[in-house]
């Protein structure tokens, strides 16, 4: 039984290309047409470059003459740039109390606006203590006021709901 070659990630290069004919693109980007793989390899070696399989699924496979080390470096660079540009959406939490003062409310609103500008979701938690549980309507009205204040910059993802001793609402940026 013959040992199975380990699967290599990335394109096949030079002698790894075992197909009879390939569609060749030279180092200048010119289409050279369908050539035997042997001839394509010779052209690549004459240029001092590598024969790299760009599109293995087409018929015949498309190969290009280029510097493989440089090709790998550019692909890694593109991948790292794409990773940098990805933004992970976080859920930030703003904690309130039913008897919040206007200035404190304004400070919380500023923080919330900053979170929305950064593209994050906001979980607003309104905590009730002691006898405040008897006046849940005050908390509900506060969350409704907050919802109205952010309607133009955020949308409600989860309406206000009571969980134990706290009322929770989740907002997402528009």
Curated annotation (Swiss-Prot):
A molecular-function term among this protein's GO annotations: ribosome binding
Pfam families: IF3_C, IF3_N
GO CC entries: cytosol; membrane
UniProt KW Plastid keyword: no
Location(s) in or outside the cell: Cytoplasm
Keywords: Cytoplasm, Initiation factor, Protein biosynthesis
Any single GO BP term: ribosome disassembly
SUPFAM superfamilies: Translation initiation factor IF3, C-terminal domain (SSF55200), Translation initiation factor IF3, N-terminal domain (SSF54364)
UniProt xrefs under PANTHER family: TRANSLATION INITIATION FACTOR IF-3, TRANSLATION INITIATION FACTOR IF-3, MITOCHONDRIAL
Family: Belongs to the IF-3 family.
Subunit structure: Monomer.
HAMAP family: IF_3
Function: IF-3 binds to the 30S ribosomal subunit and shifts the equilibrium between 70S ribosomes and their 50S and 30S subunits in favor of the free subunits, thus enhancing the availability of 30S subunits on which protein synthesis initiation begins.
Protein name, UniProt field: Translation initiation factor IF-3
Organism, scientific name: Azorhizobium caulinodans (strain ATCC 43989 / DSM 5975 / JCM 20966 / LMG 6465 / NBRC 14845 / NCIMB 13405 / ORS 571)
Gene from which the chain derives: infC
């Amino acid at each position: 039984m013959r040992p199975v070659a380990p699967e290599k990630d990335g394109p096949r290069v030079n002698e790894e290309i075992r197909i009879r004919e390939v569609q060749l693109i030279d180092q200048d980007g010119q289409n050279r047409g369908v050539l035997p793989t042997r001839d394509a390899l010779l052209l690549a070696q004459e240029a001092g470059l590598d024969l790299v399989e760009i599109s293995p699924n087409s018929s015949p496979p498309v190969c290009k003459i280029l510097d493989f080390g440089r090709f790998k470096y550019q692909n890694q660079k593109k991948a790292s740039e794409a990773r940098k540009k990805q933004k992970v959406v976080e859920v930030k939490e703003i904690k309130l109390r039913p008897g919040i003062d206007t200035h404190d409310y304004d400070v919380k609103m500023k923080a919330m606006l900053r979170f929305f500008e950064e593209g994050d979701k906001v979980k607003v938690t309104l905590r009730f203590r002691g006898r405040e549980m008897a006046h849940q309507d005050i908390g509900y009205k506060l969350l409704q006021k907050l919802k109205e204040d952010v309607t133009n910059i955020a949308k409600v993802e989860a309406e206000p709901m009571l969980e134990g001793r706290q009322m929770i609402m989740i907002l997402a940026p528009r």
